[in-house]
C-alpha cells in the first residue's frame, strides 16, 4: 500500500495556503496542455476539480466506477452547502465558518485545509451559479440562506431538498463541456487498484476496467484522489 504525504504548507493557520499560493512556481499557459492530471472520482469534489483543471488548460483524465458521473453518491446530499457570504447580515465570517466546520467534524479535520475551504467558500457558490445550479432565491432575486445543523448563523445555500443532485448536475455539465472540447477524457466503469509513486510522488494509477476486467496503467504528472468518504476512500 502506498503512503502519501498531504504536504500541508508551513506557517500560521490563516496564512498557510495564502503564502503558498503567492510563492509557488507557476506553469506557463503554453505548457499546461502538456501536463496530464488524473482525477479519481467524479462526484462533487472530483467532478468540479476535473472540469476546473480542464478549463485552465490541463489535460485531464477522470475515473469513476459508475456507468456515469451522474450516479455519484454526492447526489444524496439534501440540506445545502455552506459559505461565508454573510447574506443574512448576522455577523458571519471566514473564521466562524472554519470554527463551525471543525467543531462539527469532532475536531478530526485538517484545520489548515478547512480554513482554506472557508476562505474560498464564496467563490465556490459563484462557480456553482455560473454552472447553472438553481439555488433557492428570495423574491428580490438574491440567493436565499437558511440555518442548518451545527452552525451559528444562516449561511446554507440550498436547492429545495435536491441540493446534491443540482450541484452534481452543474459539475457534470461543466465536465461534459470540457469532454466535448477534448480537454477531459472520462473513464467510466474503472476501479483504481493502486497509486503509482515515483521518488515519493504520485505519478499515475493502476486501474481495472470493470467491463472487460483488463488491468490498465495510466500516467499523470499529478494525481487527485476524490474517491468519496468512509467506505469508498482509497
Where in the sequence are the language-model features?
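Core beta-strand elements of the Rossmann-like FAD/NAD(P) dinucleotide-binding domain
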Residues: 32-35, 211-222
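Glycine-rich loop(s) and the adjacent beta-strand/alpha-helix scaffold that form part
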Residues: 222-234
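Short glycine-rich, flexible loops that bind phosphorylated cofactors or substrates
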Residues: 47, 214, 232-233
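N-terminal Rossmann-like FAD-binding beta1-loop-alpha1 element of flavoenzymes
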Residues: 35-62
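Short, hydrophobic/aliphatic alpha-helical segments
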Residues: 28-29, 33, 58-70
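Conserved N-terminal/central alpha/beta ligand/cofactor-binding core
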Residues: 2-20, 24, 65-203, 207-211, ...
Amino acid at each position: 500500500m502506498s503512503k502519501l504525504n498531504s504536504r500541508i504548507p508551513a506557517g500560521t493557520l490563516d496564512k498557510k495556503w495564502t503564502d503558498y499560493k503567492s510563492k509557488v512556481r507557476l506553469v506557463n499557459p503554453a505548457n499546461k496542455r502538456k501536463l496530464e492530471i488524473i482525477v479519481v472520482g467524479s462526484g462533487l469534489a472530483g467532478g468540479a476539480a476535473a472540469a476546473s483543471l480542464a478549463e485552465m488548460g490541463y489535460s485531464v483524465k477522470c475515473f469513476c466506477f459508475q456507468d456515469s458521473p451522474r450516479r455519484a453518491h454526492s447526489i444524496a446530499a439534501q440540506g445545502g452547502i455552506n459559505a461565508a457570504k454573510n447574506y443574512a447580515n448576522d455577523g458571519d465570517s471566514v473564521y466562524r465558518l472554519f470554527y463551525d466546520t471543525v467543531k462539527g467534524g469532532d475536531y478530526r479535520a485538517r484545520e489548515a485545509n478547512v480554513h482554506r475551504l472557508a476562505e474560498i467558500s464564496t467563490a465556490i457558490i459563484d462557480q456553482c451559479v455560473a454552472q447553472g445550479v438553481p439555488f433557492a432565491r428570495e423574491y428580490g432575486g438574491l440567493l436565499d440562506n437558511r440555518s442548518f445543523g451545527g452552525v451559528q448563523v444562516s449561511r446554507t445555500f440550498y436547492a429545495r431538498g435536491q441540493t446534491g443532485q443540482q450541484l452534481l448536475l452543474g459539475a457534470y455539465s461543466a465536465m461534459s463541456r470540457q469532454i466535448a472540447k477534448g480537454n477531459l477524457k472520462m473513464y467510466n466503469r474503472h476501479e483504481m487498484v493502486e497509486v503509482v509513486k515515483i521518488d515519493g510522488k504520485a505519478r499515475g494509477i493502476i486501474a481495472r476496467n470493470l467491463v472487460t476486467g483488463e488491468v490498465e496503467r495510466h500516467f499523470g504528472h499529478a494525481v487527485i484522489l476524490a474517491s468519496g468518504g468512509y467506505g469508498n476512500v482509497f
